[in-house]
Amino acid sequence: MATHERKTIDLEQGWEFMQKGITKLKNILEGKPEPQFSSEDYMMLYTTIYNMCTQKPPHDYSQQLYEKYRESFEEYITSMVLPSLREKHDEFMLRELVKRWSNHKVMVRWLSRFFHYLDRYFISRRSLPQLSEVGLSCFRDLVYQEIKGKVKSAVISLIDQEREGEQIDRALLKNVLDIFVEIGLTSMDYYENDFEDFLLKDTADYYSIKAQTWILEDSCPDYMLKAEECLKREKERVAHYLHSSSEQKLLEKVQHELLTQYASQLLEKEHSGCHALLRDDKVDDLSRMYRLFSRITRGLEPVSQIFKQHVTNEGTALVKQAEDAASNKKPEKKEIVGLQEQVFVRKIIELHDKYVAYVTDCFQGHTLFHKALKEAFEVFCNKGVSGSSSAELLATFCDNILKKGGSEKLSDEAIEDTLEKVVRLLAYISDKDLFAEFYRKKLARRLLFDKSANDEHERSILTKLKQQCGGQFTSKMEGMVTDLTVARDHQAKFEEFISTHSELNPGIALAVTVLTTGFWPSYKSFDINLPAEMVKCVEVFKEFYQTRTKHRKLTWIYSLGTCNINAKFEAKTIELIVTTYQAALLLLFNGVDRLSYSEIVTQLNLSDDDVVRLLHSLSCAKYKILSKEPNNRSISPNDVFEFNSKFTDKLRRLKIPLPPVDEKKKVVEDVDKDRRYAIDASIVRIMKSRKVLGHQQLVMECVEQLGRMFKPDFKAIKKRIEDLITRDYLERDKDNPNVYRYLA
C-alpha cells in the first residue's frame, strides 16, 4: 500500500507566506483598502503553522515561530503604533491610544488563531506564557510603560475640568481607564499604582482648596449642600468611567477634606451650626448633617452631644418656667398640684414628641441619638417643680385625664395616645416606685369615690405600665381594679340578702366596698363612735359577710365612706352629701342644739386634727351648716357650735367638701419604708448566691438590681448592710473588714 509523503516546509519559505497574512491584517487595522480574510485564507495560514510545527526534527519550527509571533507585534508597535502616539497630546493622544489598544486586541485575537496550534501543544508542554498573554505584554512593555505618565496626567486634568463644571467625553475616559485594568489581566496593580494613587492625591488637593474657601464664606447649611453635591458627583464619576473599586477610596478622600478636617468648625458655626439648626427647627439641614457625618468615623458623636445639650436646655427652661409660675401662686395654694403643673407635663410630652420625631426622621433612629435623648430627658425629668417631684406630677397628670370632670377634655383616642406618652416619660424617671405609690393613691380615690371616667382606660394604662416596668410594678394596681368588680358582685348579693331577711333591714340604703388589704394603700382605721343608725348597718353587713366566708376579718375604714343625709332647715330640706365622719358629727346635733369643741371630740372619739378639719368644713367654709362662736375662720378648743337652722341655698342637693389630708408626706414615708425592705431583700439575694463579696461590688450589684424602680442612695445601702450584720444575715470578714460573708 502506497504512503503519501508530506512536503517539508522550511522556515524562510513558511514565514514568508505567514508574513503576507500578517501584512494583510495590519493593512485592515490601519484602515487601508484590503479585502477581509476568507475562510480559505484563514485555513491556509493555520495549516501552514500546523505543518511547520508537526514536521520531524530538525524541521519542527515551534520555538522559532513562537519567537516570530512576538516579533510581529514588536515590529508593528515600533513602526506604526508608537510614532502615531508620540505625535499627539492630551485628549487627541487619549483617542489614539484607545484606537490603538482596540486594534491591538484584534491583532492578538487573529494572530492567536493563526498560531493556535502552538497554544495547544508547544506552549502547554513547555509551560510558556500563552499567545494572547504574549500579545498583551508586548503592548504593555512597549506602549503602556512609555506613555502611562502622560495618560494619567491627561485623564486627571479632564476629571478636574469636569469638577469645575466643564463637559468632557466620559466614554473616552471610560475606555482609557479600561486599558489600565485590562493591562493587568487579573491584577488591579497597574490601575491602582499608575492611576488611582495619583487621582486620590489630586482629589485630596482639589477639595482641600475648595474647603478652605467654603468654610470661611458659606453658612453651615450651604457648605453641607455643596459637600453633599460633591459626594454625589464623585459617585457618578465612578459609575461613568472609574473602576468600581475606586468608589470607597475616592469618597473617603472627599469626606476627609470636606468633613473630617472641618467637622468642629462646621458644627459650631455661630449663626448656622448645629445649635442654630436645632433652635430653628431646620429638619432638612439636620437630616443632611446626619447623612454627611454618619459617613465619617465617630462623626456623629459631636452631633449627638450638641443634640443632647440642646434638648437638656429646652427641658430645663420648661422646668424653670414652671418653677416661676409656681412661685407666683398664692401661698395657701402652693401645696396643691394645679393647672400650671399640668401645663408643664403637657409641654414635656410635646417636647418629647418633637425630639423623638427628630431622632426617627432626621437621625434615622441611630442609637447615639436615642441615647442622647434619654440622657437629656433624665436630667430635667428628675427635677421637681415647687416641691412636687416629677413622679407626683406625672401621677397627677394621669389622674386628671382618667377622672370624671378632670381638666383634660380629650377624646378616647387622644386619652390612649396621651397615656402612652406619659408611660414613655416614666422611663426617664429614676423614682418609679414613688410614681407607683402616688398613682396608687389617686387610683384608689378614683375607684372608691366613683371618679373614674372609664374602666377601659384604667386597664389600658396598667397594661402599658406593665410592659414598661414589669408585672411587679402593676400587680397591686391590677388587684385594686379587680377588687372593685368583685365588690359590685358582693353588693348585689348583700342587697339580695336584705330582701330575703327583711327583719335585718337597717332602714338605710347601705353600700359596702370590700377590699383586699395587700392591694390598697394603707389607711388609718379609727374607732370612731358611730351613730346608732350606722352601728346597726355595720352589724347587718357583718352578719351577711359571715355567711359568705368564715376566715376573713373585716377592718372598717370609715374615713373613706360617704353618706347622704337630709337636713331640715327653716327655709327647706336640703340633701347633704358628706363623708361618714362629717355625717357622724352632724348627727350629734339631732339631740342637742349646742356643743362645745371638747364635747364633740369626746363624743366622736377622733383625733384633734381630724375634728378641726371636720368642723372647719362645716362651719368656716362655703356651706356653713354649723354656726360657731366666736365667728372667725379658725377652729380653737374654746369654740362652741350649733346647728345653723337659718342656712339655705338655691340647690336642693349639696356636696360638702372635706379637703383631703396632704398625702405627699405619707406617700414619701411609705416609699422610704418599702425601699428599705427592697434594699434588704436585694442584699440578701446577692449574698446568698455569691456567699462572699467586697463592699464596693455588693453596692454596685445592689444599685443595678434596684435601678429599674429607684436609684438607691449609697449611704442607705451602707446603713442596710450594717443593719443586716446586726441581725446576723451577714458578717464582716475577719481579715478584711471591706468584705462580707453570708450567714445561712
UniProtKB/Swiss-Prot annotation:
Expressed in dry seeds and coleoptiles. It comes from Oryza sativa subsp. japonica. Gene3D superfamilies: Cullin Repeats, Cullin, Chain C, Domain 2, Winged helix-like DNA-binding domain superfamily/Winged helix DNA-binding domain. This is Cullin-1. It holds the Pfam family Cullin_Nedd8. One of its GO terms (cellular component) is cullin-RING ubiquitin ligase complex. It comes from the Eukaryota. Neddylated (rubylated). Deneddylation occurs upon interaction with the COP9 signalosome (CSN) complex.
